[in-house]
Amino acid sequence: MGSRPSTKIPAPMMLTIRVALVLSCICPANSIDGRPLAAAGIVVTGDKAVNIYTSSQTGSIIVKLLPNLPKDKEACAKAPLDAYNRTLTTLLTPLGDSIRRIQESVTTSGGGRQGRLIGAIIGGVALGVATAAQITAAAALIQAKQNAANILRLKESIAATNEAVHEVTDGLSQLAVAVGKMQQFVNDQFNKTAQELDCIKIAQQVGVELNLYLTELTTVFGPQITSPALNKLTIQALYNLAGGNMDYLLTKLGIGNNQLSSLIGSGLITGNPILYDSQTQLLGIQVTLPSVGNLNNMRATYLETLSVSTTRGFASALVPKVVTQVGSVIEELDTSYCIETDLDLYCTRIVTFPMSPGIYSCLSGNTSACMYSKTEGALTTPYMTIKGSVIANCKMTTCRCVNPPGIISQNYGEAVSLIDKQSCNVLSLGGITLRLSGEFDVTYQKNISIQDSQVIITGNLDISTELGNVNNSISNALNKLEESNRKLDKVNVKLTSTSALITYIVLTIISLVFGILSLILACYLMYKQKAQQKTLLWLGNNTLDQMRATTKM
């Protein structure tokens, strides 16, 4: 028995998973509450589970293209089988030749190996230009060379079996499953029926089914005609080749039914042809599957913004498109490393960015902390559906209720209007008629107004206008400065030298001293003059008194 494929997760990925799991165990994750945000033009459109993955699992599907018919019916179906066999060889021989050229390009000399590989790739590409993806695919094809050789050793036994699904493990380094969609048809139609069929009917049935399968093969390998062996096969193509038997390999590799539908939609399950043998009509495909780690309690929340009415015009909230929350921590999630499906995110790494306190407060329900940008124009869709209801900006469009008839008006200062079946059963918005089935309960906040201070300018045109105003102000300031410089140029520089300034200061001090002394002297003279006046007045009064006394005598 061969060894089973390793499903161990690499150390760097395991470290990432452990860190994320530790964070997720701090506190259960709560999704962002969209009820207080809806009336502010911020709509929570949905959540997705966050998973981390690496493409580390591989298995092989050996597609048995030529079925084995019962001995008593081989002669009846010989003609359609021979035609089918010739068509298969014509269709798939370029694929087989391309695979062999690339695998045989490996030499023991290190210097010429890369050159031979690139030459083999370019030899199989129509335009003569090998892309990075094609070089990567060729390298993977070379790595699978030994496994393909091991499968070819068993080709006779695989071709001889009548089983539609057969697990091949002898001498193989990874799980391999031989499947035959046509063999399944033969077994169901001829081997398990007691009804006798005439030879013509057998030939017709086999011919029709083989033609249908050839059509599927042409659809699958259409892109391979221009660059054989270098294009990945999608999961849909693998199912076309293997039919329902594909599930057997996926189950063996540990893909459960609960993950299968999501992984199929992600495009992470792919296949690469690694061999084609025209003698036995066997086609080997190496299937690559992801190892997926589920991050408990980590969800990605998607946010959409609606153009709202403000006193400064139409504006939209400045919030991230995708955020993730673990406990009380909310951060922006970078989905450029992720593949999205309807319910899941599959990421090679988790990258988050911290948010400003204002945005954090806004997403926590404090709508007065939300900031808005005047970037949305009047042609932006002014409404959004959510859970059977509508959030609309009835300032930008006419919200006409068909049943019951009426116009839904948006009060002055309100950012948006929340419309549900309670207020309108059938709503017409710009020629689009919607039947409402949802309801906004009392927990939804309404009548939210956006203050002027919450609206900022971030649009390119608006910023250009503001920059123009700033440039005008700067130009005016430069003109004033130039005028001031002209006035300063008229000043005699010699009068402003250091020695002249010292002289001016000394002279000023001397002048001040003389001025003070003069003031003191003037005050003294005035005081002395007043004293003399008093003395003369006193002498005059005494003389007058003496004269009066002499007259009386």
UniProtKB/Swiss-Prot annotation:
The inactive precursor F0 is glycosylated and proteolytically cleaved into F1 and F2 to be functionally active. The cleavage is mediated by cellular proteases during the transport and maturation of the polypeptide. Keywords: Coiled coil, Disulfide bond, Fusion of virus membrane with host cell membrane, Fusion of virus membrane with host membrane, Glycoprotein, Host cell membrane, Host membrane, Lipoprotein, Membrane, Palmitate, Signal, Transmembrane, Transmembrane helix, Viral envelope protein, Viral penetration into host cytoplasm, Virion, Virus entry into host cell. Its main location: virion. It is found in: Virion membrane; Host cell membrane. One of its GO terms (cellular component) is viral envelope. Residues 1-31 form the signal peptide. It is a single-pass type I membrane protein; Single-pass membrane protein. Disulfide bonds join 76-199, 338-347, 362-370, 394-399, 401-424. Belongs to the paramyxoviruses fusion glycoprotein family. This is Fusion glycoprotein F0. It comes from Newcastle disease virus (strain B1-Hitchner/47) (NDV). The gene is F.
